[in-house]
From Swiss-Prot:
One of its GO terms (molecular function) is peptidase inhibitor activity. Its main location: virion. It is found in: Virion. One of its GO terms (cellular component) is virion component. Inhibitor of the prohead protease gp21. Minor capsid protein. The keyword DNA repair does not apply. This is Protein inh. The keyword Oxidoreductase does not apply. Keywords: Protease inhibitor, Virion.
Length: 226
């Protein structure tokens, strides 16, 4: 359940203070707080006990919120949802209401354009080959970019619990995911570089299993990312 290889690397560090600091950061990924005044080995024991406690908690009966739920809620808030499908109420709570702008636009009248303006219209011959090429280029440009994980990537998030399990994700990382529907295409655009490995790990599990169940730390709610 605990990443023993990573723990061994930390224990091998010459600077014990740095090792315990990194160990505390590792624990925070699961929403676990540790006391840094304890010895390294005792902190490891505390983390293992906390992970066992998390693993024994019952799994949620629902799949939580998906990215589609969040997108539908955002579309509904902006008046862009045109189907009759009901918006998930939990997703709607996560989406802020649009900000009303008080900007005033001043309309300035200009001289009217004469109605009898002579406009030269030239007939351009239709070239089917060029048209099809232009359409193909547009379709290609609109394809979503695909992010490729680093070669031999190994996730730093460990799944806990029964079946496929779940992983704990800091709330501020989940908030960015919820606000960025295409986050899987450009995870490195998140301004906090310390979160990139976590995002890579989530993409790893989604690519492998089709989805990943996370537990965000603010409300301890479960959410399914696809």
């Amino acid at each position: 359940m605990i990443d023993k290889d990573y723990i061994a690397e930390l224990k091998a560090l010459d600077d014990n203070k740095e090792a315990k600091a990194k160990l505390a950061e590792y624990a925070e990924q699961f929403g676990i707080k540790v006391k840094k005044n304890k010895s390294f080995d005792n902190i490891v024991v505390d983390i293992e006990e906390a992970l066992q406690k998390l693993a024994s908690e019952p799994m949620p009966e629902t799949d939580g919120l998906s990215i589609k739920d969040l997108i539908d809620a955002a579309d509904a808030a902006e008046g862009l949802k045109y189907d009759d499908e009901e918006v998930n109420p939990e997703a709607a709570l996560l989406i802020d209401s649009p900000i009303k702008s008080d900007i005033k636009i001043e309309v300035v009248e200009t001289d009217k354009i004469p109605e009898n303006t002579d406009v030269l219209i030239e007939d351009t011959p239709f070239v089917e080959e060029k048209f099809e090429q232009a359409v193909a280029e547009i379709i290609e440009s609109e394809k979503p970019s695909v992010f490729t994980l680093p070669e031999n990537f190994s996730p730093n998030l460990q799944l806990i619990g029964k079946n496929l399990g779940f992983c704990t994700v800091p709330w501020w990382i989940y908030q960015w995911i919820a606000e960025t529907p295409d986050w899987k295409s450009h995870p490195t655009s998140f301004e906090h570089a310390s979160a990139h490995q976590t995002l890579f790990s989530l993409i790893y599990y989604i690519n492998r299993d089709g989805s990943v169940l996370i537990r965000e730390t603010r409300n301890s709610s479960f959410v399914t990312l696809k």
